[in-house]
Amino acid sequence: MLACLTRGNLLDVLQEGFNEQQLQAYVAWVNAQLKKRPSVKPVQDLRQDLRDGVILAYLIEIVAGEKLSGVQLSPSNQQEMKSNVERVLQFVASKNIRMHQTSAKDIVEGNLKSIMRLVLALAAHFKPGSSRTVSQGRDSRTSVQSHQPHCATAVAQGAAAALADVCHDVSRSGRDVFRYRQRNASVDEEIENPYWSVRALVQQYEGQQRSPSESSCSSLTSPSPIHSAKSESIITQSEEKADFVIIPSEGIENRTDETGSPLSRDWRPGSPGTYLEATWEEQLLEQQEHLEKEMEEAKKMISGLQALLLNGSLPEDEQERPVALCEPGVNPEEQLIIIRSRLDQSMEENQDLKKELLKCKQEARNLQGIKDALQQRLTQQDTSVLQLKQELLRANMDKDELHNQNVDLQRKLDERNRLLGEYKKDLGQKDRLLQQQQAKLEDALRKLSDASYQQVDLERELEQKDVLLAHRVKGDTDEVTNYNSHSSQRNGFVLPVAGRAATTATHRGPQSSDLQLVRDALRSLRNSFSGHDPQHHTIDSLEQGISSLIERLHVIETQKKQERKVRGRSPRNQASSEYRASWPPNSTLPHSQSSPAVSNTCTKVLYFTDRSLTPFMVNIPKRLGEVTLKDFKAAIDREGSHRYHFKALDPEFGTVKEEVFHDDDAIPGWEGKIVAWVEDHREN
């Protein structure tokens, strides 16, 4: 039915010259589709009836089989009408149908060109079959099948007439294309010309000649079996193509957009003078390929017509029945011509078969090469698969090893975390101990301040003792002087002075007790400080001062003894010895750093304690090698439990610290003296 509304002058269609007959054809096609929905009213005017979009929605539902949602069946204003048309255009765009210069506003305003373009786009895309076309094809097939050939001459005449008409139409198409190219200078319109395709020409010719042949029984419609066998498909194809090939510019635009042809991509309806961007060489190549395909099809058609002309049947029918070389009642010349034609036909068929055989052999070689290549590729892939399996195995082994390492590291991490927790606990304990020590340090500082006051008091008492000692020394000197004068008066006889000795001992007894009291006070003061307190140095200085005073007394007594050597042992010397014996064993030069009157029979001892940075020195009245640990303990006079280390020379290791445990063990010496370290065993 669309073929009717597209038949007209092509130039008028391109120039938008729509006549009343074409409009009626559009209306008739739309109404023919709307008949499938009896409830829908037929269309009278395309401008008014399709502008609301409802008829278009029904048309899409009929031709496409899809119902549009959201369509207002009774639009009351322009906005609802525009919404319906926009939904129709969205559906068309979803089907990849390109609608150039078509908008919902144009259709709502009644633009006839846009409405016709949309109708043709739907017809070109969905291709609904016309009932009349189907009925015509059915009637033509029935008539053709019922028509049987009469003789070979009639067949030949029909074929000759058909070929002549085809050649005439081809020449017409060439002239029409040339004239149209000169007028419009456009190539894509040439492709859309109704006389472009040879198949279309033959089909058009057969379609045009079929109706008069039915009435006049013309010989142009060949009643041969090949025509009856192929006409069915040819007629159907021609009728389907007739609906869409011969269409105006709107149909051209939609169909070429659907197929994706580059020749009509830039074409716009209403502008026939627009040129394409593609070059003429590409266009000519496409035309040449198209013509080659059409010529191949025409050649096959002519070959079939020739076989039908010579044999009166299809080539496959010839294989089923024997071929008669001589037919009775036929002119020998005609028979010879027919035989030669058959021979030529057989040779051509032989050549075609040879070509097909060579083609099959080439394809077989190609397939064999592809097979070999695939086999080689398969071998390579097998090798690659084996390598991948080996790599996978190695990767799994590495993974297991890494897992084991991870487990080991996790175990070590747990152990470290446990140790860290213990260290944190120890650190907390050390912090608490540090706080306790700080508290003790504050207490010791407080005691130190108290001790400083006690030290001042002791220094004051010491000064008093020094003054008292000086007075007593002066009194002793006076007594010695008086004694000497008295002895000279006695003419050298020494009288018993037991009473004086007793008096001297009586005077020195309190002096010895006072000295012991001072030493006890210093010892208690030293114990009140920590091991590294700087106040120990002050206490050591005080103790050294007291030792110096005692040393001076000892020097004075020594001088007195030397003066009395010539007189023998007098009661005064005996009293002095008794006074010396009344001192404690460790009072002999205690904690002195200098000893000006040390003889060879004494051993100098230098020792360090953990409570003082200053070393102490004492003299022991024994030779080096004879001094024992008991003598050393008696000399330093330290209370409590201690450990004693002495500097010694080892033949194997050199200079070492040797610890002595037993009191009877001899103490090693170092360069003529003894160097010792005294450590408090309770602190360790």
Curated annotation (Swiss-Prot):
**What are the Low complexity biased-composition ranges?**
211-228
Q: Subunit info?
A: May bind filamentous actin. Interacts with the complex composed of DVL2 and Rac. Interacts with AXIN1; competes with MAP3K1. Interacts with MAP3K4 preventing MAP3K4 interaction with AXIN1. Directly interacts (via DIX domain) with DVL2 (via DIX domain). Interacts with gamma-tubulin.
- Please list where the region (Disordered) is annotated: 207-235, 560-597
Under the heading SMART domains, the entry gives: CH, DAX
- Name listed for the protein in its UniProt record: Dixin
Ranges in a coiled coil: 277-308, 336-461
About its domains, the entry says: The coiled-coil domain mediates interaction with MAP3K4 and inhibition of AXIN1-mediated JNK activation through MAP3K4.
A GO biological process of this protein is: modification of postsynaptic actin cytoskeleton
Q: Where is the composition biased (Polar residues)?
A: 571-597
Q: Which gene encodes it?
A: Dixdc1
Tell me a GO cellular component.
focal adhesion
Read off the lineage from the record.
Answer: Eukaryota, Metazoa, Chordata, Craniata, Vertebrata
Q: Post-translational modification, briefly?
A: Phosphorylated on tyrosine and serine residues. Polyubiquitinated, leading to its proteasomal degradation. WNT3A signaling increases DIXDC1 protein levels by inhibiting its ubiquitination and subsequent degradation.
Q: Where is this region: Actin-binding?
A: 127-300
One MF annotation (Gene Ontology) recorded for this entry: mitogen-activated protein kinase kinase kinase binding
Q: Which residues carry this modification: Phosphoserine?
A: S186, S231, S592
